[in-house]
Amino acid sequence: FSMDSKFISINAARHDATKHLSLPIVGDAKLALKTLSKACSGFKASYEWMSFAQDERRKWNAYVSDNISVVNNRPNSYAQAIGVVNAICDKRDRIVAAAGGLPAEVTANWRTLDIGTVDVEFGFSCMGYEIAGAWGAKIAQSQNESEKDTISFCGDGSYLMLNSDIYSSVLSNKKLIIILLDNGGFAVINKLQNNTGNESFNNLISDCPTINEPFNVDFEAHATSMGAMAETVSNPHELADAFHRAKASDRTYVIVMKVDPYEGWTAEGHAWWEVGTPQVANSDKVYDAHINWEKTRKRQRRGV
């Protein structure tokens, strides 16, 4: 965004409408947008801007197509799993994601197929919403589109924190399809840890220094014990076949696939995120990360 850009923040709650350097509007989103549209009547972006935007969109589409591709022999990734489901699901199926790396990966790589079909909990990193929220979404979806599926993308970390509504979904006959992507812990926080110059510590199960013998969870058996159908796949090609079986199932279906904790993250489309880094450190890597991070502030609009 240009340094002189202004952001209009719309929210029904006064506290949440007021954001840093924004122009807040307290009110209903639809009514506010209608009013703003009238105020913008006659506005048209310049030809130069439209051409730039269209060119960037073409570049982005090409990047996503390559990012979700399963034809090359690379490690399993979130993006590949997202691409597989996106290509097979019905346009009225609803997807749910929350917490960890999946909200950003879904936002970047999912091509929305229809209105009101994407539910990504982003603001509070609400671990566990993936399954509990999906169950609630399926209850709502059943009112008008009972034949369509609710699909949850869930990491192993969030799954272990809150999974009991798998049982609830089976008990209440509200079928979910859960894509459980196992990266061995909390890999996106491990990535953040590494990106700020730190060594991996206590985010991946394999990096817990107090654990003598780390072990994998049998997610397939666990989901089955709560009444769900479940299977484990080795790669995106097997995931596609399993997803077809999940679509045909009459009850909650969990598909487990390991993904690489280090490779395959979406590298484009990121926004700047202010993360505290120490000004003084014994580690050169941490200090260098702090210096590099400070350099990225040049486009920050502090407002104070």
Where do the language-model regions lie?
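Glycine-rich, acidic loop regions that bind phosphate or pyrophosphate groups
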Residues: 1-53
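Short conserved AdoMet
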Residues: 2, 90, 248
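Thiamine diphosphate
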Residues: 17-18, 24-26, 30-34, 105-106, ...
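Short coil/turn segments at secondary-structure boundaries
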Residues: 48-52, 98-99, 258
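A short, charged, Gly/Pro-tolerant segment at domain boundaries
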Residues: 53-61, 260-262, 271
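Active-site diphosphate/adenylate-binding microenvironment
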Residues: 57-145
